[in-house]
Amino acid sequence: STALEIRPEIRLTLVQLLSDAAGAFGGMIAGQTLDLYAESVGTANGDEDIIARLEEMKTGRLLRYACEAGAVLGKAPLEQRQALVGYSRKIGQTFQISDDILDREGDQNLMGKTLHKDEAQNKFTIVSRFGVAKAKKLAQKLTDEAIETVNIFGKKAEILQELARFIIERNH
């Protein structure tokens, strides 16, 4: 068996995971649909749980697939696979919150895109609902939790912990 050969049952698992991640029932398609719906009705009635679910179904599902596929290919035991899924959920939400903060107060030259688009489009975000200060606190809490979640991997977790820190510290 070479490194390029992946058993059919593993391929099937990977395709199923990708289908779930992209899907209309809790995946990225559902997240985008909910996002567009929330834009049309406004953000005034949104709560933190709804916004977190929305964020999880977008960026979070993509990151979850990457982590979970790696765990499947690496034949990780269930406990490690679950840790990676938990980690991906937290960094996915952190990424989205950081992106929303940067949209509000980032440097347009560094970002390479027009700022304040979320506000102009009435986007349903933690920042629009609760403000930048609360969003920053939540992003830090999620980052700390993500770092803790992968401690199960010992020294091997360092790259994942660095990624979590990068997501919250990035300026573009």
Could you describe each region identified by the protein language model?
Residues 1-172:
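All-alpha prenyltransferase/terpene-synthase fold signal
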